[in-house]
């Protein structure tokens, strides 16, 4: 019979499982160390200490290796571990956190003693002395220099890591991030000093070494260094002679091979520039050539080692330039470019795991601090500090950001840097990448190394995931708030509680200018108008604006966007859903700011079709803007207009739905949700629906009650309407064909149909706040001089006898779009004999087309237009591509039925399939048509009115680039691509036309 032993007789030693050891050999390892032979309290405490190591199995394996090494003095170490809690905390924490430091201890088995007793971090002076003394000692024995200096460096990192990590295992004091980062910089300084001394000995031997100062920049300069980091330096010499250059180069070589990578890439001209310069040479460069980012780098400059007087002279000369960098003409453009570069550096698939460059990551915090320092440091010396933590504190104290916000940002920054330190310690490798979130073992290790404990609802790994999410969200929110909240405080009325007040109006204007606003005073007035009134709206706006303004600052035209947002907010003030949607759905707000800051066309539509804003969000299937089918909109538009007997009300109803659909299409286009071909088809669909609605309304208005229409009417779409390739600024090119009702003469039917067609054109063309609805019938036989409406027989007779080359060419894009469908199809069958004659068009007609094309190129381009950048009539533009396709259709459609197509793009496919033009040349034509169409659409979206000419370099061209879907807002880059694409296409056009 089994009897349970009394508690007093149970073994005290915890089992391997209770200790959390999962390695199959863990039990054997414990026995090998002799830790399972006794069950006294000392051994129990020892084992529980081991269990708290971030990776207890890894720590145990290194302990076994130490025990096996005769140089360790295992008996002494074992006794110390049993009796000294602080040693256990430091050693177990290090061995469970860093495989590399474990290897260092095994290779240097007496170094464990550095973690014993009352351990304190050595001073900067003591570190310098120990490293330089060793450098002097090993200079005579260079063979051992690297090993001994590296071991000294690792020993100091070991001591720091032991103190930094000890609290994860035992109740030991916690070192602050600032202490750890500053001490790492002190170690780096000492290592640089040792490398410099060795370099001087190697290069100069017994001669006096040159006066050389090493300026630390980056994290080392700011004394906020990582455990593993490149050390960025700039060299300053009294004379930039070959000896100084050799000493600097040798110092970099020694340091990089012994301690860490030394990088001089931030020097003037970067890696292409001289390694060493004099103070005067530095001054000349920064006065004349330096970019904004180079001044930003100098924010953290510090004379680290070498000639102290020379280093201070360098700083005294250069730092005043740093604090006036914001006055430079290109400051704003370069700041915006720096922001874009940060975002584009990280591949999308790892962005969520990137501590440094990901959204809500370390670079977001550092960018905020540095930009605000550059903007306001000119007039406030309290901001002349180097480290990110000190800068945020100073900004809070100075009223440039809220004190609480500064404290929160510092806390988030220090947490993210803590994780970065732990990740780097593991293998002493430079990394900023979090483990895969579903890698349970790796996430749990990181959580334990960062001293994150379970809370009852989550284990340590779960707590880390939650904390990361919280910190990233907080940084992202504060990133916007720190830029804009103080601006609101500077203009808010006394009765509106936003936060503390501090920033002057001049400082607010400087900050807005740095964030991309060309009219900062006007922008402040708009902001004041949004928050300076009583009630809930002002309070909600004060909460929303920091985030909205941050998103808006990334748009090409934040000034125009802010004005549009103010107008929209004032117009929608009675709509309760508007502000609550922006508050509760960040995706809607972000997309709206992009649209408002890019386009003049869509905001005007949104003022009268605000419900489209509610579709800026996402559903489970994707963006709501794409849930609407153009065909469904067309049916709804026709049905809505059909409910009214009054033609004006019918057309007003059609305009309302068209307005909403244009707002939807334009929004989706600007947000990159639609391809250009989808945009063209959707715009064509809504135009056709408007034509159908207007035609039906006018037929009803001209038909007596109880009577019947005197004729059937079909509307034939021509040009881009016929090809379903309309753009935002396109008119509707049409022809009308009628068929009199039975008992009605042709003359009566034509007269009645002409009245209907005239009314359609007039009513749709009535001036309106909406984009115009111009109906153009000038492509009909005889142009403006010909009858507006003809019967089928009249068309047949005319085309059989009188058709001119341009009229035949125009028929290539004829397509029945509205009115009587059967009549429209009969018209198309009739004109097929003209546009696709059995034997092809005559050589005279082809010659005439070529002659007209040459005349168009020389005469139709507007006066003053640039032929290289006119999207419609310019070199390689839309007209060039379309005329080329139409010439090939005229020459070959009688033999190739696939060319019986009104679409330019689909006809290009047929041309390639039939090998009428080489496939690579067809690709050039297609690319040019798509590029020009995107650009032409973008011009309307940006300017708000039809135009075909690309603007010159500047903000408007940048906006066109963004609206056209270019991958950034670099208008110059976009324009270069446009010119390249159209130039290549023009060569193909000339080849086809034989010119």
UniProtKB/Swiss-Prot annotation:
It comes from the Bacteria. Its cofactor is Mg(2+). The keyword Transferase applies. It catalyses: [glutamine synthetase]-O(4)-(5'-adenylyl)-L-tyrosine + phosphate = [glutamine synthetase]-L-tyrosine + ADP; [glutamine synthetase]-L-tyrosine + ATP = [glutamine synthetase]-O(4)-(5'-adenylyl)-L-tyrosine + diphosphate. Residues 1-487 are annotated as: Adenylyl removase. Residues 492-995 are annotated as: Adenylyl transferase. One of its GO terms (biological process) is regulation of glutamine family amino acid metabolic process. GO terms for molecular function: [glutamate-ammonia-ligase] adenylyltransferase activity; [glutamine synthetase]-adenylyl-L-tyrosine phosphorylase activity; ATP binding; magnesium ion binding. Its EC number is 2.7.7.89, 2.7.7.42. One of its GO terms (cellular component) is cytosol. Keywords: ATP-binding, Magnesium, Multifunctional enzyme, Nucleotide-binding, Nucleotidyltransferase, Transferase. PANTHER family: BIFUNCTIONAL GLUTAMINE SYNTHETASE ADENYLYLTRANSFERASE_ADENYLYL-REMOVING ENZYME, GLUTAMINE SYNTHETASE ADENYLYLTRANSFERASE. Belongs to the GlnE family. Involved in the regulation of glutamine synthetase GlnA, a key enzyme in the process to assimilate ammonia. When cellular nitrogen levels are high, the C-terminal adenylyl transferase (AT) inactivates GlnA by covalent transfer of an adenylyl group from ATP to specific tyrosine residue of GlnA, thus reducing its activity. Conversely, when nitrogen levels are low, the N-terminal adenylyl removase (AR) activates GlnA by removing the adenylyl group by phosphorolysis, increasing its activity. This is Bifunctional glutamine synthetase adenylyltransferase/adenylyl-removing enzyme. The gene is glnE.
